[in-house]
Amino acid sequence: IISPPVCGNELLEVGEECDCGTPENCQNXCCDAATCKLKSGSQCGHXDCCEQCKFTKSGTECRASMSECDPAEHCTGQSXXCXXDVFHKNGQPCLDNYGYCYNGNCPIMYHAQCYALFGADVYEAEDSCFKDNQKGNYYGYCRKENXXXXXCXXXDVKCGRLYCKDNSPKQNNPCKMFYSNDDEHKGNVLPGTKCE
């Protein structure tokens, strides 16, 4: 059962141009609370590209860039809504060729992924640590297939479990790994990482 639209419930429903609540409570200068239609001369009532009841000027940024792979979006000047969030194509080089774009991010090995798991003084381990990913067991693998660990090919050893070097005085662990019983993928190299 679909209930009919109700003007004044602060929900934008079919047939309404705006809905700012009851006439007593409406705080939107662009909207006629009694009819849920825009007032005369108003182009819009709300949204990221609506300012003082008019569409925001074309080219005005409405969504900031979150990374090199996620460009900022801008108002079109023809709509109250911000343009759809788009990313650079997956596989496009980023961060001076250290990584590839993947779903709007630029995941790289180096310090960032180890830091996120373990904190300061932890860096990407030596290449020799990653060779364990060829074993295809609980400690080293590339991916899971039917709950079984599948080994990495020699060329892909840096695409599986993430090995970090802990330089802190108490640890001094050259091949540190992260284990999680809640998330079996946590502790793996992030998807999309340039793992050469």
From Swiss-Prot:
Inhibited by EDTA. Transmembrane segments: none annotated. GO terms for molecular function: metal ion binding; metallopeptidase activity; toxin activity. It holds the Pfam family Disintegrin. The N-terminus of alternagin is blocked. One of its GO terms (biological process) is cell differentiation. The keyword Magnesium does not apply. Its main location: secreted. Disulfide bonds join C7-C26, C7-C36, C18-C31, C18-C36, C20-C26, C30-C53, C44-C50, C49-C75, C62-C82, C69-C94, C69-C101, C94-C106, C101-C106, C114-C129, C114-C164, C129-C175, C142-C152, C152-C159, C164-C175. One of its GO terms (cellular component) is extracellular region. Gene3D superfamilies: Disintegrin domain. Expressed by the venom gland. Binds 1 zinc ion per subunit. Keywords: Angiogenesis, Calcium, Cell adhesion impairing toxin, Chemotaxis, Developmental protein, Differentiation, Disulfide bond, Hemorrhagic toxin, Hemostasis impairing toxin, Hydrolase, Metal-binding, Metalloprotease, Protease, Secreted, Toxin. The keyword Cell division does not apply. Ca(2+) 1 binds at V6, N9, L11, E13, E16, D19. PROSITE patterns: DISINTEGRIN_2 (PS50214). Its cofactor is Zn(2+). It is found in: Secreted. A motif (D/ECD-tripeptide) lies at residues 68-70. Its EC number is 3.4.24.-. Belongs to the venom metalloproteinase (M12B) family. P-III subfamily. P-IIIb sub-subfamily. Disintegrin alternagin-C: potent inhibitor of the collagen binding to alpha-2/beta-1 (ITGA2/ITGB1) integrin. Has a chemotactic activity on neutrophils and this effect involves actin cytoskeleton rearrangement, FAK, PI3-kinase and Erk-2 activities. Induces endothelial cell proliferation, and these effects are mediated at least in part by an increased expression of vascular endothelial growth factor (VEGF). In injured muscles, reduces both MMP-2 mRNA and gelatinolytic activity, suggesting that it changes the overall balance of extracellular matrix protein turnover during muscle regeneration. This is Zinc metalloproteinase-disintegrin-like alternagin. It comes from Bothrops alternatus (Urutu). The lineage of its organism: Eukaryota, Metazoa, Chordata, Craniata, Vertebrata.
